[in-house]
């Protein structure tokens, strides 16, 4: 997992609330077994509309998504997070996230940042007025800066540390590889090992 400390990038203003995981990545994309290649399916039904914001060349290469409240509702599918990441997003800023989506995002290195609705609105308006507007998501300081806005956000210390170290569940476990090897060596030979 890629470490996240401070990220500065342009943003895509998605003026929609209650965006569910089926809208983020439709179910026909869930047949894939790898984690890459999902960017093409991101919001694919909406992207069929030429006026959809992701189709605007002014937002090409943006790495931050500005979303309405209740982003990531619906079924639990890590594919939604993988699609956002594969498209190039490092962070999503919203007034509220579905709990399961938030957990999946944090577990995969996509930073879901909860900000007051008026802050998200101010950032969205600024990006709509000037798509070259850059926003900084500073996990070290737990702060978002851009377009004259400075807003703090909450994230527990352990999750923050994991993101800053680039550790998903597997990476965290592998930090204890030597302990695991010692433990397995002390067990009867007929028991399974990780090697």
Swiss-Prot record:
Give yes or no: UniProt keyword Chloroplast.
Answer: no
Give the EC number: 4.2.1.33
Biochemical pathway: Amino-acid biosynthesis; L-leucine biosynthesis; L-leucine from 3-methyl-2-oxobutanoate: step 2/4
InterPro entries membership: 3-IsopropMal_deHydase_ssu, Aconitase/3IPM_dehydase_swvl, AconitaseA/IPMdHydase_ssu_swvl, IPMI_Swivel, LeuD
GO MF assignments: 3-isopropylmalate dehydratase activity
- Give the reactions, separated by semicolons, that this protein catalyses: (2R,3S)-3-isopropylmalate = (2S)-2-isopropylmalate
* Record Pfam families: Aconitase_C
Q: What is this protein called?
A: 3-isopropylmalate dehydratase small subunit
Species this chain originates from: Parafrankia sp. (strain EAN1pec)
The answer to whether UniProt assigns keyword Hydrolase to this entry is: no
